Amino acid sequence: MLGQMMYQPLLISSLIDHAARYHGEAQIWSVSTEGGVEETNWAGIADNARRLGSVLTDAGLAPQSRVATLAWNNRRHLEIYYGVSGAGFVLHTINPRLFPEQLVYILNHAEDRILFFDATFLPLVEGIRPHLTTVERLVLMGPRDEAAAARIEGLEFYDEFVATGDAGFDWPDLDERTASSLCYTSGTTGNPKGVLYSHRSTVLHSFGSNTRDCIGFSARDVVMPVVPMFHVNAWGTPYACAMSGSCMVLPGPDLHGEALVGLIDRYRVTIALGVPTIWQGLLATARAKGSTLESLTRTVIGGAACPPSMIAEFRDRYGVDTVHAWGMSEMSPLGTTNQPLAKHGALPIEAQHKLRENQGRPPYGVELKIVDDDGNTLPNDGQTQGDLMVRGHWVLDSYFQLQDQPILSDGWFATGDVATLDRDGYMTIRDRSKDIIKSGGEWISSVELENIAVAHPKLATAAVIGVPHPKWDERPLLVAVKAEGETPDEAELLAFFDGKIAKWQVPDRVVFVEALPLNATGKVLKRTLREQFRDVLTG
């Protein structure tokens, strides 16, 4: 016997319809490529999304055709998010920071039919166009630009493209399991792999994000996603904010500290989301300009382990609560967020602060476990380290166009992380499996060493890698970037570890570099560092 309740499919079109119907006047401020600020609202986004959906449908695109973007966080990109998926096509957001060869591979592998792009990327698109085998239409995201039209034959313009559409377009009825968006993993080796999300997984992910003990956006929030919309759907923020009716600030291409502080103060941002490297610049600017970040109540930090010193500065200097989060492209990306339990209020304040440093617990919809090398489940005791496995409603089961290559083990996905879990489900990422340092049979967490190093006031940032050692197999090496105007030496930095970790875990050496090599999503390329410094202890 089935329950006697209505069935309505979980579709992305229902999110934008809800936002327009019940939160239509909620404002959205969008920084343009040129630097000006446009103001719209959810009703305006919904109208243009429908217009776009109607134009794409009338163009004769086959259902599930891929439509790509090379774009920053702005209102046109937000309209494309809903117009493409809502009309039954697949939104393919592409990271413009990839090498041109990777962009060509991704566009061709995805078999994209249309490419929307911001004016910033006109030279890039001009260069790769001859190598694109499936793209039929190129659309610059803006008004007509005759100079741009002269550079690319047949170039179309978004504002004209959408103006011909129908704001009364009816969204198609779709199976909720229909593919909605596509994102390729950044990967530090080999070609990127595609992760294909569904309408169902996206809406469920939004429900998960909006639970109070997760991120919990509300109609009273002004949300600024600094995480790019070309990276894992901006952590699902554009969808979750439509569900909650939050106002949004879309920061455009300039993510430097001065620009972000200005947006927070001007538009009274309450929640901002991004990776640690972004917040380093923002905090430095706030200190220099004397901004109190008065409106900001929460930062959500993921993409890499958040240094405890950063959490402390947000908390103690600005009264901002930091929600430490973890996830990955294969998880849409939400895996865990760190929110305290009721019992933690009885802990000493320092113990409460310490608890907030780990990656937190999964929301409903995600399950975690750790296993040993033989696949045996390990205890949740907060001490035992193992390979982290996940499963859930918004976790992939195969990569795009690689369905014949199984990646699950008994229904679980191996994340490639080494972690611990405690009895309450709080997770601490100890390292990536490939980055953990194996020294004399013991494991040393590079993340733990990095968190200590970046707390030193004379360092801008740092990475720790394992390098070959004639006796211990591997030993940790600290690769450091000096803060502007500072001149720390090796002895000073190594002494900073005293009393914070066991002596045998302290890095053997320090090398200084001008900048750390980063991949397209801002993560440190430790493989590059290992190759560069592999002989530093043996040469």
From Swiss-Prot:
SUPFAM superfamilies xrefs: Acetyl-CoA synthetase-like
Summary of subunit composition and partner proteins: Homodimer.
Disruption phenotype: Cells lacking this gene show a delayed growth on methylmercaptopropionate (MMPA).
Record-annotated site: Plays an important role in catalysis: 523
Pathway linked to the protein: Lipid metabolism; fatty acid metabolism
Protein name as catalogued: 3-methylmercaptopropionyl-CoA ligase
pH dependence: Optimum pH is between 7.5.
A Pfam family reported for this protein in Swiss-Prot or TrEMBL: AMP-binding_C
Entry EC number(s): 6.2.1.44
Organism whose genome encodes this protein: Ruegeria pomeroyi (strain ATCC 700808 / DSM 15171 / DSS-3) (Silicibacter pomeroyi)
Family from the record: Belongs to the ATP-dependent AMP-binding enzyme family.
Binding site for Mg(2+): 185, 330
Binding locations of ATP: 231, 303, 324-325, 329, 359, 417, 432, 523
Regulation: Activated by LiCl and NH(4)Cl. Inhibited by dimethylsulfoniopropionate (DMSP). MMPA concentrations above 2 mM relieve the DMSP inhibition and 80% of activity is regained at an MMPA concentration of 8 mM.
GO molecular-function term, one example from the UniProt record: acid-thiol ligase activity
Function (record text): Involved in the assimilation of dimethylsulphoniopropionate (DMSP), an important compound in the fixation of carbon in marine phytoplankton. Catalyzes the ATP-dependent ligation of methylmercaptopropionate (MMPA) and CoA to yield methylmercaptopropionate-CoA (MMPA-CoA). It is also active with short-chain-fatty-acid (carboxylic acids up to six carbons in length).
Enzyme class: ligase
Annotated GO biological process: fatty acid metabolic process
Key words of the record: ATP-binding, Fatty acid metabolism, Ligase, Lipid metabolism, Magnesium, Metal-binding, Nucleotide-binding
Catalytic activity: 3-(methylsulfanyl)propanoate + ATP + CoA = 3-(methylsulfanyl)propanoyl-CoA + AMP + diphosphate
The protein's required cofactors: Mg(2+)
